[in-house]
Amino acid sequence: VLYVSFGSLAFVSGQQIEEIALGLEDSGFPFLWVTRPNMMYGQSPNFSIDFLERVKERAYFVDWAPQLDILAHTSVGGFFTHGGWNSTLEAITAGVPMLGWPYFSDQPVDCKCIEQGWKVGLSLHDDDNAPLKSLVSRNVIKTKVEELMTSNKFQDKVNEWSLSSIKASIKGGSSSNNFLSFVESLKSHP
């Protein structure tokens, strides 16, 4: 299953929503898509009855989802994301490869890390690694989703990073130790 969620702040045009929908359909993979009520510049996505009928056996649409629970589910094989920092870390910890589509702020850098740094997925960007300004076609989306969902290299890499993040978080790990050190420094300064 491909989990699709573009965060709480990204807005997408109606034409782009249609291209995403058709790209997901053409990929052939089952998907769970969080379609926020205001994600189309204040409007809700309005999918055609024909589209909904064609994908009804392998698509599920919700306006909110418990992201950590979904990413932790064993049936989730990929995450189509805006590449926000929290979503990126949650996916890595859960061991889920990502297809990043950055919009603004930290997202272009995060998506560059996803694809080029950590090699735990792919991203959609222009030649300068800037967010895309133009319409992305269903064919590009289909191709990227297929590559994400069928390539073992992303799953292998994200599993390595997931294990590292878990080790860092447990007692004696680097993140755990840094957190405890931070708490102690706060206690010593009234």
Protein language model features and the residues they cover:
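Catalytic core of nucleotide-sugar-dependent glycosyltransferases
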Residues: V1-P190
